[in-house]
Structures are given as structure tokens and as C-alpha cells.
């Protein structure tokens, strides 16, 4: 009898914990209704109507040399193309520090449409990421590359950001390729510190920040 009671108690405990875990997962993922993560980019792209409502999409990409990982991030910001371009190319502005994922940021050099910046992220304290960003105003494209991958524990990290006018707003398409130990785990980890959290936060931060700064960048 005692053995049966013990088995029933264990079964009840496991069921209760399983339900609790499921509830937590539903709650956590329910906090991100305006975002979508999928395996592959559909042929017709994300829903433009949902993009206009503020939804952001992330899709997995296969790197060109089949090494490492890649992603494409797509979202829309409520700002004209010209104003948003000025916002994205203002590499030395203090407003970047209002992003909770950035703890330090400085411009090392900025001339001839090539900017070298150093950024320390909250998720990797003490590590300076030195980025080179090449601005192409005629095509509204930004090409970026991590210049010190070894110091950041990476093999490589590069990509580009393409801006496109959509009515009175701007569509942002960011593509990146990277590789480092644990890249697959980082890419699929859904909470703080993972790729999805980082990208969704960056997109949301821009969507909320640029409308407040339109007077500065128009």
C-alpha cells in the first residue's frame, strides 16, 4: 500500500511540474506576440500587413560556404527612409546607450562612409566588439563586419542591412553570417542572451526610439 501511495505521489508530482513547465513556456512565448521565428524564409516573404503593424520576423539562413550559421531579420519602422538612414548612420550618438543591451559604445574612426566602432554588450560584459560599417547612401545599404572575431570568441561575423521605402515607413532587412563555439545553441536559445531575444529587442528598441527622434533626423 505504501509503495502504491509513493508511486501515485511521484506521478502526481511529475504531472504537476510538467503542467507548470508548460504554463511557463506558454507565458514566456506569449510575451512575444509581435515576433515570429521560423526555419526558412518563405518564397513570398513575410506578411507585409503584419510588418506594418510592427511584427518582426527572423528566418534561418545557410551560410554561403556552409560553415557557421546565418539569419535574416525583417521589420518596419515608423519613419521615412531619409530620416531612418540618418538615424542608422549616426554612429556616435548617445541615444545608443538607451538600449539596455549596450553598455558601452564609441566611434574609433568615421570617414569616407566607413565607420569603425567599439561596442560592449550587456550579454558579454568586458568584451569589445570592433565593427567596421560601410555606408552606401545611394542604395541605402550598410555592410558590417566584426574586425576582432578572435577577441570576441568568434571565427567570423559579417552581414549587411538593406533599407527600403514602404509608403511613409522604412522596411529593414538585416542579414548576417557568423560562427563560434555554441553558435547553434545561441541561435535557438529563446531567452535573455540568445540570438532571438537580442534581435527582437534591437528591432523593438528601434521601432520605439526612432519616432521620438524624428525631429532630429528629418
List PLM regions with ranges.
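Bacterial N-terminal signal peptides that target proteins for export
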Residues: 4-23
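Bacterial N-terminal signal peptides
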Residues: 21-33
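Hydrophobic ligand-binding cavity/cleft-lining segments
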Residues: 36-111
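Glycine-rich portal/gate segments that line the openings of hydrophobic small-molecule binding cavities
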Residues: 64-68, 93-153, 178-179, 204-218
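Intrinsic-disorder/low-complexity, polar/charged segments enriched in Ser/Thr/Lys/Arg/Asp/Glu/Gln
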Residues: 68-74, 141, 158, 169-173
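Hydrophobic/aromatic beta-strand elements that line small-molecule binding cavities or substrate pockets
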Residues: 72-75, 105, 128-135, 158-165
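A short, structured loop/turn motif at beta-sheet edges
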Residues: 78-82, 109-112, 134-140, 162-171
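Beta-strand/loop substructures that line and gate deep hydrophobic ligand-binding cavities in soluble
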Residues: 148-200
Amino acid at each position: 500500500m505504501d509503495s502504491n501511495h509513493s508511486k501515485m505521489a511521484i506521478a502526481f508530482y511529475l504531472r504537476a511540474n510538467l503542467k507548470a513547465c508548460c504554463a511557463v513556456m506558454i507565458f514566456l512565448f506569449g510575451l512575444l506576440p509581435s515576433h515570429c521565428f521560423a526555419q526558412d524564409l518563405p518564397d513570398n516573404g513575410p506578411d507585409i500587413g503584419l510588418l506594418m503593424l510592427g511584427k518582426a520576423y527572423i528566418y534561418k539562413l545557410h551560410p554561403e560556404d556552409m560553415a557557421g550559421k546565418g539569419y535574416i531579420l525583417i521589420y518596419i519602422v515608423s519613419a521615412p527612409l531619409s530620416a531612418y538612414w540618418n538615424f542608422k548612420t549616426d554612429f556616435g550618438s548617445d541615444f545608443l546607450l538607451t538600449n539596455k543591451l549596450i553598455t558601452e559604445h564609441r566611434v574609433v574612426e568615421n570617414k569616407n562612409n566607413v565607420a569603425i566602432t567599439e561596442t560592449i554588450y550587456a550579454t558579454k560584459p568586458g568584451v569589445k566588439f570592433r565593427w567596421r560599417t560601410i555606408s552606401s547612401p545611394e542604395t541605402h545599404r550598410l555592410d558590417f563586419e566584426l574586425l576582432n572575431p578572435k577577441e570576441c570568441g568568434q571565427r567570423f561575423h559579417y552581414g549587411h542591412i538593406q533599407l527600403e521605402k514602404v509608403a511613409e515607413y522604412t522596411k529593414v532587412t538585416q542579414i548576417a553570417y557568423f560562427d563560434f563555439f555554441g553558435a547553434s545553441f545561441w541561435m535557438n536559445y529563446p531567452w535573455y542572451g540568445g540570438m532571438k531575444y537580442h534581435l527582437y529587442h534591437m528591432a523593438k528598441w528601434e521601432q520605439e526610439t526612432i519616432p521620438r527622434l524624428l525631429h532630429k533626423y528629418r
